[in-house]
A protein has these predicted regions:
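Electropositive, glycine- and tryptophan-enriched low-complexity nucleic-acid-binding patches
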Residues: 51-99
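Short, surface-exposed basic-aromatic patches at helix termini and helix-loop junctions that form
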Residues: 113-121, 143
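Active-site- or DNA-interface-adjacent structural scaffold in DNA-acting proteins
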Residues: 1-47, 120
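Acidic, metal-coordinating catalytic cores used for nucleic-acid/nucleotide bond scission
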Residues: 102-110, 128-133
Length: 277
């Protein structure tokens, strides 16, 4: 079984997978979440892949259609590289016209945003303190409008509230748009940038009254006309963690696999096919 997967060329098997996805999912719409996953294995291998005391490691970056609940494709991250170089390769290999591509903070790069725009798609990308200047600017923009009662043309807001499991959760999505000026504000480091998004999450424990809040920031090529759609897209991004990566870890026990090299890459594709069937 292991030998069977080891003799198949990963590029060929990936092509078969992509063609199969096209048959199952005729058209991709809505949110396409992109995220990387480290596959750890106990086996040692040669210098072709990253090794260490923990043994074989394989980074795969996957694209997940949140609406269709299916993996659209994946690429291997080269050992001497990272997700930043792998993500554009994956995006360029997919038909994403009209989709909203969501990525964590690793995707907050000029080349990645340019690739998404060139594929006729939009993006929502998390921004964190590893991009210090951009993060501080985004935070300042959102903080200026977060708690204002008045809504002016450049600001829209969507509020949702959920009660359950002994707590009340309130989420406020604030979208601030300066249109084409936004790109200049960020010194053209993010292609197609139109809006900054702030998600303020407030949680109250009913029994104790304990209150916590957190604000997360995003950059997007979408304008501020549909804040509810943006809030929904950000929540849908987590489906790649819950419905793909978690299943690979728990159901298929990917981290306990003894497969290496081609076998590991091919079996990763096979498990994603199995999740859809």
């Amino acid at each position: 079984f292991n030998r069977f997967f080891s003799i198949i060329k990963p590029e060929y098997f990936e092509l078969i997978f992509r063609n199969w996805v096209k048959q199952v999912c005729q058209e991709v719409k809505g949110v396409v979440a992109i995220d990387g996953k480290l596959m750890r294995g106990p086996s040692q291998c040669d210098g072709e892949h990253t090794t260490g005391k923990e043994g074989f490691k394989l980074w795969m970056v996957s694209a997940w259609s949140a609406v269709n609940g299916i993996s659209l494709g994946q690429v291997k991250v080269d050992d001497k590289s990272n997700e930043i170089t792998a993500i554009p390769l994956l995006i360029n290999s997919l038909e994403l016209s009209g989709c909203i591509v969501t990525i964590d903070a690793m995707g907050c790069q000029k080349d990645i945003t340019q690739t998404i725009i060139e594929r006729d798609a939009n993006y929502i990308i998390a921004i964190k303190e590893n991009k210090k200047k951009n993060y501080q600017l985004a935070k300042q923009i959102i903080d200026d409008y977060q708690d204002r009662d008045e809504i002016i043309n450049r600001v829209t807001r969507h509020v949702s509230e959920n009660t359950g499991h002994g707590r009340v959760e309130k989420r406020t999505c604030t979208v601030v748009s300066y249109g084409s000026i936004m790109e200049k504000m960020f010194k053209k480091k993010l292609v197609g940038l139109k809006s900054i998004v702030g998600i303020k999450s407030e949680r109250t424990i009913v029994a104790t009254g304990e209150y916590t809040q957190e604000v997360r920031y995003y950059v997007t090529s979408l304008d501020n006309t549909k804040p509810e759609e943006i809030a929904s897209a950000i929540r849908q991004h987590w489906s790649i963690e819950n419905n793909l990566h978690w299943q690979l870890d728990v159901t298929f026990r990917e981290d306990y696999s003894k497969k290496v090299k081609n076998a590991a890459r091919n079996f990763s594709v096979a498990t994603k096919m199995a999740l859809t069937i």
